[in-house]
């Protein structure tokens, strides 16, 4: 994967808004169906992945248990920036990975807690908009009230 102008702009933006070694999450546009993600971003930007599940693979990070752990990692590491890369979302391999797993809790978490701050072709950079209070606990309390 070569670093082109879009990637350079994305890296520069994150470097200007975070500290070296700070955790950021570089994910896919959607996490219920995966092809690949841009893990080179972590190396180029000199930023850390907040979770051991940074290399996204169908059948792993598309499961409820792993997405739940990823959410807990994003919360516990106080990740303020999330990068959603939509480049490979439409890729459909000739196997079961072309179908949605139906698990969308990571995307729901990102949508509920991060707001768009910058965009580039196929890339959206989001900034944390809510406090780090434990998303599952807030979600459970909200469901009890309803």
Identify the meaning behind each predicted range.
Residues 2-9, 62-66, 98-102, 106:
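Soluble or luminal CAZymes and related metallo-dependent hydrolases
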Residues 61-62, 67-70, 143-144:
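Short, charged/polar low-complexity linear motifs in solvent-exposed/disordered segments
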Residues 2-60, 70-71, 79-92, 120-128:
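Short periplasmic/luminal acceptor-recognition loop of GT-C membrane glycosyltransferases, typified by
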Residues 81-146:
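Aromatic/acidic, Gly/Pro-rich catalytic loop(s) in extracytoplasmic/lumenal soluble domains
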């Amino acid at each position: 994967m070569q670093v082109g102008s879009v990637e350079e702009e994305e890296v520069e933006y994150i470097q200007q808004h975070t500290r070296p070694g700070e955790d950021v999450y570089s994910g896919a546009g959607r996490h219920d169906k995966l092809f690949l993600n841009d893990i080179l971003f972590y190396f180029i930007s000199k930023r850390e992945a907040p979770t051991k599940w940074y290399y996204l693979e169908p059948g792993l990070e598309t499961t409820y248990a792993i997405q739940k752990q990823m959410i807990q990692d994003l919360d516990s590491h106080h990740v303020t920036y999330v990068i959603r890369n939509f480049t490979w979302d439409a890729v459909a391999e000739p196997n079961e990975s072309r179908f949605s797993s139906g698990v969308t809790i990571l995307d729901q978490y990102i949508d509920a807690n991060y707001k768009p701050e910058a965009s580039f072709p196929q890339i959206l950079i989001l900034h944390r908009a809510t406090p780090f209070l434990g998303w599952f606990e807030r979600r459970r309390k909200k469901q009890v009230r309803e």
